[in-house]
Curated annotation (Swiss-Prot):
Cysteine-cysteine disulfides: none
UniProt subunit comment: Homodimer.
Catalytically driven reaction(s): tRNA(His) + L-histidine + ATP = L-histidyl-tRNA(His) + AMP + diphosphate + H(+)
GO cellular component, one term: cytoplasm
Keyword Hydrolase: no
Xref: SUPFAM superfamilies: Class II aaRS ABD-related, Class II aaRS and biotin synthetases
Gene3D superfamilies linked: Anticodon-binding domain, Bira Bifunctional Protein, Domain 2
The name this protein goes by in its record: Histidine--tRNA ligase
Subcellular compartments: Cytoplasm
Highest taxon of source: Bacteria
Family as reported in the entry's similarity comment: Belongs to the class-II aminoacyl-tRNA synthetase family.
Length: 417
């Protein structure tokens, strides 16, 4: 019978990789909690229309990357390619806007996109997302960026660059779109890549986001969106920058930063690193006023960001896994019940450890204890079983002593195990 293997672009995460993800989520909860965020869990499956209406039908995500299929009643469903749309749907459906003027929500979990798998980018990937719904003020944008940078710092990441731009609003962006379209019509379109030629007709702003060197060279002199911001958008953006300056947060004004999803407006930002190759973006987000009403909800403004967990994991400094406090080495099959009960007593007092069940020589039992990484090995054989004792061996110094089984927990705790 043939062996069943995982799907291309999907990964199994064992320690230490899974430990890194757990640590990342733990730091996220600690940092976001200080800013008043609460956790929301949304379904992996959503109706396809949700993403078509939010992300945009002309985006690469909707056109080429979504895992979409009909269910048994021929309803089109999609495995979420990003989290914000699902959060907006949950926000509208729950009527949360009637319960509180501001909602601060964070989510984490797997997303799915049919892309070419590469370093830091899988077809199933994981994100941490934060959304602030309610405030229209630029202070919400700035606070979110400050929180993101604090989160990345507390993960121990260095060598990051915050890039920021303003995409304007529904009043001024059409003027920029026309100016950009006129510019693109004046250059040699045949020299652009196939995707950019398509984007010229459907979403000209996305041409600026192209990573193909030839396209970037051809559009180097394109008009910038900042030059076309209306006074209100410019005032909003200046306020965001002023707050970042006051906190001495370095940033780069990147007038080509447009992001890949259609719902963004005004402030948009991205955190990049040159240490993980071509997939240098580790986090990004922006303001999306109008998205909630576009999905059938009230006219509530919002701003948010997403962090790619696989990409963050590539940069995180290694953390030594906590050592187990004990390992019970069973030398006599008759002592297995007592070994299990001893381990349970120790765990009830907050100590972590394992039991080496099964028969074997003392040499093989000690080898198993060494592999466990435990600080102390508790040796339990026939003599110890009869006497109600256990041999406690310090796995670092090699020193050992025989004590009563009811004294083991105090002994391990006193030793700082």
């Amino acid at each position: 019978m043939s062996k069943i293997t995982k799907i291309k672009g999907f990964a199994d995460l064992f320690p230490p990789e899974s430990d890194v993800f757990t640590r990342m989520e733990s730091v996220a909860r600690q940092v976001f909690g200080r800013y008043g965020f609460v956790e929301l869990r949304t379904p992996i499956l959503e109706r396809t229309d949700l993403f078509c209406r939010s992300i945009g039908t002309e985006t690469d995500v909707v056109q080429k990357e979504m895992y979409t299929f009909p269910d048994r009643k021929d309803r089109s469903l999609t495995m979420r390619p990003e989290a914000t749309a699902g959060v907006m749907r949950a926000y509208i459906e729950s009527g949360r806007h009637t319960q509180e003027p501001v909602s601060k929500l964070f989510t984490s979990g797997p997303m799915f996109r049919y892309e070419r798998p590469q370093k830091g980018r899988m077809r199933q990937f994981h994100q941490i997302n934060c959304e602030v719904l309610g405030p229209v003020e630029p202070h919400a944008d700035a606070e979110l960026v400050l929180m993101l940078m604090r989160f990345l710092t507390e993960l121990g990441l260095t060598g990051l660059s915050l890039q920021i731009n303003s995409l304007g609003c529904k009043e001024c962006r059409p003027l920029y779109r026309k100016a950009l379209s006129d510019f693109l019509a004046s250059i040699d379109n045949a020299a652009l890549c196939e995707d950019c030629r398509r984007r010229m007709e459907t979403n000209p702003l996305r041409v600026l986001d192209c990573k193909v060197p030839g396209c970037r060279e051809l559009t180097a002199n394109a008009p910038t969106i900042l030059e076309h911001n209306c006074p209100e958008c410019r005032t909003h953006f200046d306020a965001v920058l002023r707050i970042l300056d006051s906190r001495n947060v370095p940033y780069v004004l990147n007038d080509r930063l447009v992001r890949g999803l259609d719902y963004y407006n005004r402030t948009t930002f991205e955190v990049v690193s040159d240490s993980i190759g071509s997939q240098g973006s580790v986090a990004g987000g922006g303001r999306y006023d109008g998205l909630i009403s576009q999905l059938g909800g009230p006219d509530v403004p919002g701003v948010g960001f997403a962090c790619g967990m696989e990409r963050l994991a590539l940069m995180m400094p290694g953390a030594e896994a906590p050592r187990p406090h004990f390992h019970v080495a069973v030398l006599d099959p008759a002592a297995q019940d007592a070994a299990l009960l001893l381990a349970e007593d120790l765990r009830a007092q907050g100590l972590a450890g394992s039991v080496g069940f099964g028969a074997g020589s003392i040499k093989s039992r000690m080898r198993l204890a060494g592999k466990s990484g435990a600080r102390a090995c508790l040796i339990l054989g026939g003599d110890e079983l009869a006497a109600g004792t256990v041999v406690v061996k310090d796995m670092d110094s090699g020193e050992q002593e025989t004590i009563g089984r009811d004294a083991v927990a105090a002994r391990l705790l006193a030793a700082g195990a």
